[in-house]
């Protein structure tokens, strides 16, 4: 029975010392959105609750301002 080593999840924003998550930082936000447009939960990403709330608000704000799409492109 082989045991697989799982990498410990850590909060990227705590490690970087981020105070606020900016809704204009599209590349950072895209890392926390699935290809279907859903926000990835913190139990998968390892983000702390404080930053997960900021992340959700920033993603919703960016969607509202049409910086990122609500869903994937329907072609």
Swiss-Prot record:
| Keyword annotations | Ribonucleoprotein, Ribosomal protein, RNA-binding, rRNA-binding
Q: Name one GO cellular component term.
A: cytosolic small ribosomal subunit
What InterPro entries would the database entry show? Ribosomal_bS18, Ribosomal_bS18_CS, Ribosomal_bS18_sf
Q: Look up the domain of life of the source.
A: Bacteria
GO BP term, example: translation
Keyword Ribonucleoprotein listed: yes
Q: Which GO terms describe its molecular function?
A: small ribosomal subunit rRNA binding; structural constituent of ribosome
- Keyword Acyltransferase included in the entry's annotation: no
Sorted alphabetically, which PANTHER family does this protein's record hold? Answer: 30S RIBOSOMAL PROTEIN S18, SMALL RIBOSOMAL SUBUNIT PROTEIN BS18M
Q: Which family does the record claim for this protein?
A: Belongs to the bacterial ribosomal protein bS18 family.
Q: Which HAMAP family match?
A: Ribosomal_bS18
Q: What is its biological role?
A: Binds as a heterodimer with protein bS6 to the central domain of the 16S rRNA, where it helps stabilize the platform of the 30S subunit.
Designated name of the protein: Small ribosomal subunit protein bS18
Q: Which organism is it from?
A: Cellvibrio japonicus (strain Ueda107) (Pseudomonas fluorescens subsp. cellulosa)
